């Protein structure tokens, strides 16, 4: 008789179709692939996109509305729109992150393993077009009219482009998953000229390593960038008293 202890099975989890749709739309919002005041496709169009009923789509949209991510508007200019992040939303996000801080630490650790190796592979495989994209993201991020939201969107695009350039779809998927987890925390970071300048500097370092097709330097620079980002999130979210307690 086989010993059940030898198996690593997971219990069946029946995910509703509406939950599946909600997760995909929420991921796109978190990753800034849709920005505030962008209008979602109509319920009918979403039903066609997801091959689902309009009732199911409506359930998914109601869940997103309850989270404060979208708003349904009526009238001549009605529709469903992405809502901007408010101060209250920031407060809720911080509370949610701190309630499950151990999970965030696991994500930081996972990111440290995945993204530097993605940069290593990208240095060998990146195309001229992808390098041009990365450069354009850096240029846009330091423009005077670059909003906080667009700055965050450009940061996501920069990292996802490198992941795609790795040529490994599993790695690209992993980086999307990582960004979905850490983006709410990054949205809490300050936005000013110093932040923009620091971001430009480290992204330029990564870009130069990729342009040189230097795998080791690309990996090391990305690893340094990720460590700095994790430290910044920690310093922003964890109070000095909590930090002292964690160090004892």
Model regions: which residues?
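Conserved amphipathic alpha-helical segments that form helical-bundle/coiled-coil interaction surfaces
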Residues: 107-188, 198-205, 217-231
């Amino acid at each position: 008789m086989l010993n059940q202890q030898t198996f690593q099975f997971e219990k069946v989890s029946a995910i509703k179709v509406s939950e599946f749709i909600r997760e995909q739309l929420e991921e796109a919002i978190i990753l800034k692939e849709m920005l505030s005041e962008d209008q979602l496709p109509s319920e009918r169009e979403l039903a066609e996109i997801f091959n689902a009923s309009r009732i199911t789509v409506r359930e998914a949209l109601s869940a997103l509305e309850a989270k404060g991510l979208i708003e349904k508007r009526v009238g001549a200019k009605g529709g469903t729109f992405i809502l901007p992040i408010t101060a209250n939303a920031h407060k809720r996000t911080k509370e949610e992150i701190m309630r499950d801080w151990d999970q965030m630490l696991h994500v930081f650790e996972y990111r440290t393993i995945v993204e530097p190796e993605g940069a290593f592979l990208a240095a060998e495989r990146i195309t001229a077009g992808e390098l041009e994209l990365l450069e354009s993201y850096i240029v846009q991020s330091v423009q005077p009219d670059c909003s906080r939201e667009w700055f965050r969107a450009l940061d996501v695009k920069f990292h996802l482009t490198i992941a795609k350039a790795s040529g490994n779809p599993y790695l690209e998927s992993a980086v999307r998953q990582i960004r979905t987890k850490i983006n709410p925390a990054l949205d809490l970071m300050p936005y000013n000229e110093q932040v923009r300048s620091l971001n430009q500097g480290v992204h330029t370092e990564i870009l130069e390593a990729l342009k040189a097709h230097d795998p080791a330097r690309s990996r090391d620079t990305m690893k340094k960038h990720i460590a700095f980002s994790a430290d910044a999130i920690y310093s922003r979210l964890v109070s000095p008293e909590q930090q002292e307690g964690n160090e004892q």
